[in-house]
Amino acid sequence: MAHFGVVVGLMMILVFLVFLSSIHKVEEGHLAVYYRGGALLGGPGDPGYHIMFPFITYFRSVQTTLQTDEVKNVPCGTSGGVMIYFDRIEVVNMLTPSAVYDVVRNYTADYDKTLIFNKIHHELNQFCSSHTLQEVYIELFDQIDENLKLSLQMELNVMAPGLTIQAVRVTKPKIPEAIRRNFELMESEKTKLLIAEQRQKVVEKEAETERKKAVIEAEKVAQVAKIQYRQKVMEKETEKFISEIEDSAYLAREKAKADAEYYTAQKSADANKLKLTPQYLELIKYQAVSANNKIYFGSNIPTMFFDSSSRSRIEGKSA
């Protein structure tokens, strides 16, 4: 009876262990694909706890969020025969949940080795074999990232729709030490040349700035002189205009004065012409004689009061 209790206890422990081994957890951002006897079962499992047949069924967790795959120490031979090594290449990619089953079925759960790692090796070797070391190491190095991303994505669109490449980052390749020193020396000389060119450009820019400042100052002086000249011309024109106005006013006044004097004289002459009749002249003569206090002697005194006709008659009688 005691042995039976021990056996029952062992059986319960075994059942408990089997139950524990059948429970598994899928993390958030992952999907679980199940295999039974090496065959892929349909329908990936969502994040959370799941139960499966122990020892018969097993699962693989597949990430469906952004992940970074690293490809290390990739050899690459240039067109000149120089062997270089890319120490690390990072590929940021993401697999959509709807494409997990098809990608795993076609390329296994380690799809990144087939679709990314091998493709990186292939594309880099093709790139290096068609370019010189100078182009790979310096001139075209900034284009390697984008070229790898585009070529990877183009092939994945055909082979594994749903797997997208977000970015590719390539480190500077390792080259033979002697060549590296030559490149560094060349870059140093190039940097010195660029510095000299930039310094020359700065000097030229300063000279150009000074020239422009001188031109601006000269234009400013010329404009000021022109404004002053115009101001003087306007002042002279204003003075001339004022003088003409004053002259016109003076001439008008003088003309009016002369016209008035002429009119007065003319009217006075007309008045005198009307007033100086023979009778009036006789009256004036008598008044003048009567007002004269001088005494005259001679035979002609009586005749002074007669006119010329009377005088001629008197002289005729005397004769």
UniProtKB/Swiss-Prot annotation:
> What GO molecular function annotations does the UniProt record carry, in alphabetical order?
lipid binding; ubiquitin protein ligase binding
Extract the Gene3D superfamilies matched here. Band 7 domain
**What does the UniProt keyword field contain?**
Cholesterol metabolism, Endoplasmic reticulum, Glycoprotein, Lipid metabolism, Lipid-binding, Membrane, Signal-anchor, Steroid metabolism, Sterol metabolism, Transmembrane, Transmembrane helix
Q: Which GO terms describe its cellular component?
A: endoplasmic reticulum membrane
Bilayer disposition of the protein? Single-pass type II membrane protein
| Lumenal side stretches | 24-319
Could you tell me which residue ranges are on the Cytoplasmic side of the membrane?
Answer: 1-6
Task of the protein: Mediates the endoplasmic reticulum-associated degradation (ERAD) of inositol 1,4,5-trisphosphate receptors (IP3Rs). Involved in regulation of cellular cholesterol homeostasis by regulation the SREBP signaling pathway. Binds cholesterol and may promote ER retention of the SCAP-SREBF complex.
What protein is this chain from? Erlin-1
Signal peptide coordinates: none
UniProt xrefs under Pfam families: Band_7
Task: Give the location in the cell.
Answer: Endoplasmic reticulum membrane
Q: Which GO terms describe its biological process?
A: cholesterol metabolic process
Q: Carries keyword Ribonucleoprotein?
A: no
The family annotation for this protein states: Belongs to the band 7/mec-2 family.
Main location as per UniProt: endoplasmic reticulum
What are the annotated glycosylation sites? Answer: N106
Q: Which residues cross the membrane?
A: 7-23
